[in-house]
């Protein structure tokens, strides 16, 4: 990767827009210090030591008007996130003041940064690779401490190290094969080369397949489980949603059909982010608005990773209950018998044995739902092993799957007795695909597309 430092100077607001204690406007580039100094009244920023914070005021150089009282952080290249000169202006939080300072910096010669451009420069300047750059956004978007743990390990380079070490081993193997082909001084050189390839490709395949086994857990922790709460009207779906959220998001009444649409909320269940979808009760109805909600509920059920089927334990099973039991039987399903605080009338013998009796009203057995989720998706294992490297990014997972396919092609070719020089092609392809993960062999279009998904100022 080429080290690029011939960039213009960019600027953006790095804190969320709105009222707050502070706002931060960031500059990065060769002229960052000069541009910041042109609007700063205080110490000469071009002469202060690196990694210092300096008190002063931002002024409009045209009018001399004071815009705000600020603290300015100065960080000199190359010991910065972008490996360029970086200035961060810490202002009082607020839309007007941060925008005013941003416009001043642009007027003085800075360019408005594109989404993710600061991190893109860190990548292009060799400060981080592509997996570490993606981890930056994963940290920002992490919904639980477990998801953040995985993202921090990726930012620290755990996945990069594993991929780079594997690529180097593949390169060493290719070099040895090439030597054996070019200098066939021994009669058994072909057998030696075949044995080497077989041993190494099986080793690489085993390593990457083990990494793929972490993908299910990692992806769930990163993206969450899409969880549909289903049941006929007025069995307690919205009450369950509110109980899990510990706040009133859904309307709870005794009137069947109150939830007429799909309500979505995130909740942290023992470190697992659940995207809870409270669906309208699935039943036949003449109400047009409710019909739309019912259809969306069926769609949510089809797309869900997890289904919470709520039944009313104080009533006998209805045809609607039986229909939902059949509709959800092939899903990752947890059957919840609600209203167990009332007299029980439901026919337990008609239900699978793995139901959980609960009372949303008294909070009975709600904790068992969390335990069952752990059992269904994590085989009762710990969510995150401290020293393990996890795959959680769909792009990484897809590329690792492709590398495993390439290695399988090498092994299949060896079994068929194909010439070694032809099998080199698949092994070389494996090396190239792994390079796409770290960015060493990623096309420019992919890099541009990835960083365009970042937020402004990052």
Curated annotation (Swiss-Prot):
Domain of life: Bacteria
Residues reported to bind K(+): 234, 253, 255, 258
Gene Ontology process terms (BP): tRNA methylation; tRNA wobble uridine modification
Lineage: Bacteria, Bacillati, Bacillota, Bacilli, Lactobacillales
Main location: cytoplasm
EC number: 3.6.-.-
UniProt protein name: tRNA modification GTPase MnmE
Cofactor: binding comment: Binds 1 potassium ion per subunit.
Binding site for GTP: 234-239, 253-259, 278-281
Subcellular location: Cytoplasm
Protein role: Exhibits a very high intrinsic GTPase hydrolysis rate. Involved in the addition of a carboxymethylaminomethyl (cmnm) group at the wobble position (U34) of certain tRNAs, forming tRNA-cmnm(5)s(2)U34.
Enzyme class: hydrolase
Family listed: Belongs to the TRAFAC class TrmE-Era-EngA-EngB-Septin-like GTPase superfamily. TrmE GTPase family.
Gene: mnmE
Binding site for (6S)-5-formyl-5,6,7,8-tetrahydrofolate: 26, 88, 127, 458
Keywords of the record: Cytoplasm, GTP-binding, Hydrolase, Magnesium, Metal-binding, Nucleotide-binding, Potassium, tRNA processing
